[in-house]
């Protein structure tokens, strides 16, 4: 499986990124729950557009590869073994995904939402992301975190290794929600602060997604 966040993090560090766009509540950020998205653009309308910390949104095209809409081929391209990853994602029933990032000095937040043909595919993918990020960053994941629904797990990296690419305490969350897999990461001043924001972000993002 791909180590998706780590590769995009490397792109952020290389690009430096501009100051970004201040977060505001746009129609995408206040979308109501309805039918399952029928295409990637409809999925993008359900992804959060601002974050509780107020970090500015990073324009999609300032990242390499760009954030925003993702195809199966895009996500497979994060892997060292693209052909195998394409087969895994196909087996999971991957349809499309969306990435969004917010960044300022010392702070970074990411939200990935991926849609699958079935809840089983989303659950398998979320579990794979959790396992691979845990292997990469170390630590012991919490598979029944307080305050988050069933199907979610979290990982707190209090003192990241220099080679990890993380610059400060970081908290990850991975959730399966119907046919959706949601991955959230927050780099903050402390793991407690990051965890509080992760919990809020997960709740807000899941509230925007239908279960199908």
Say what each PLM segment does.
Residues 97-102, 169-177:
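Short, surface-exposed beta-strand/loop micro-motifs that present aromatic residues
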Residues 187-212:
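Surface-exposed amphipathic alpha-helical segments
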Residues 18-98, 202, 206:
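N-terminal "mature-domain start" segment
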Residues 37-40, 78, 119-172:
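Short Gly/Thr-rich strand-loop-strand
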Residues 95-127:
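A short acidic-to-branched-hydrophobic micro-motif
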Residues 1-7:
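Bacterial N-terminal signal peptides that target proteins for export
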Residues 110-112, 179-188:
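Short, well-ordered beta-strand elements
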Residues 13-16:
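C-terminal motif of bacterial Sec signal peptides marking the signal peptidase cleavage site
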